[in-house]
Amino acid sequence: MKKFLAILLLAGCVSGVEAQNNANEKTLFEEVTGLKKKSDKFNFFLNMNGSFDAMDNQAGKSGKFNMRQLRIEAKGQVNDWLSYRWRQRLNRSNAQGNNIDNMPTSIDIAGIGVKLSDKWSMFAGKQCANYGGVEFDLNPIEIYEYSDMIENMSNFMTGVNFAYDATPNHQFNFQVLNSLNGTFTETYGDVPVEMTKLPLVYTLNWCGNFNNVFKTRWSASIMNQAKDKNMTYIALGNELSLGKFGMFLDFMYSKEDIDRKRIMTSMLGGGASLPSAEYMSIVT
């Protein structure tokens, strides 16, 4: 299917907390809870990305309006050490099905953040995998079409992330997440392997900033796919800014004992995932 026309309809964020015109007049929230409402405690966002898609394929020519992204998000800072974040897609099914974390895939993020010290913090709950790459870190409403590797990855899973701020410009993360959303069969098909007892993915991440000229977002991950079957994923995101000139270069490599992304499996007719696959991608 070839898409040759796309029009960005709307991409924006709407803040859900506004000050009263009269500072002496209490809001409904204050009347009910007795608490003074502050913008850092609750913020609401609406993220939208739409297009008009014109297609020319074997079925003929056609066109339609398409709402690519429609997400609502609430996040806030409860106090100086506790925060929360929730983001959900309105154009994805809310059925939780057989999801191992008991949450529907429409929920991208749902968890709490805790500041453990001046340098250490953690986030527990459903969250985005801390993979490297500049493209991977962009807001989805800013993306028209992801590269094939990112488009076919599972990016939102449940677990915990620990962050260490070595300096104001360098942060290191260690993250442990479920490696599945649904069941093993839903993810890989009928593959003749023994399931692992700990379907987890472990990620080390480094976010660096060198005088706002060169920035890094690098990661290394290992995923338990099945017993004695693993996936190794390396992502090196690099961003360069020189005055009015800017560019980024992402390098991604994935070695999978079971074809997790299923790109090669789909090219060969679908069905159960191939017993092994390797992918490499460069995006700039």
Regions of interest found by a model, annotated:
Residues 19-122, 162-172, 239-241:
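Beta-barrel outer-membrane channel/assembly domains of diderm bacteria
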Residues 50-56, 69-71, 80, 88-94, ...:
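Transmembrane beta-strands of outer-membrane beta-barrel pores
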Residues 199, 204-284:
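Detector for outer-membrane/organellar transmembrane beta-barrel domains
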Residues 61-68, 103-108, 154-158, 196-202, ...:
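Residues that define the transmembrane beta-barrel architecture of outer-membrane proteins
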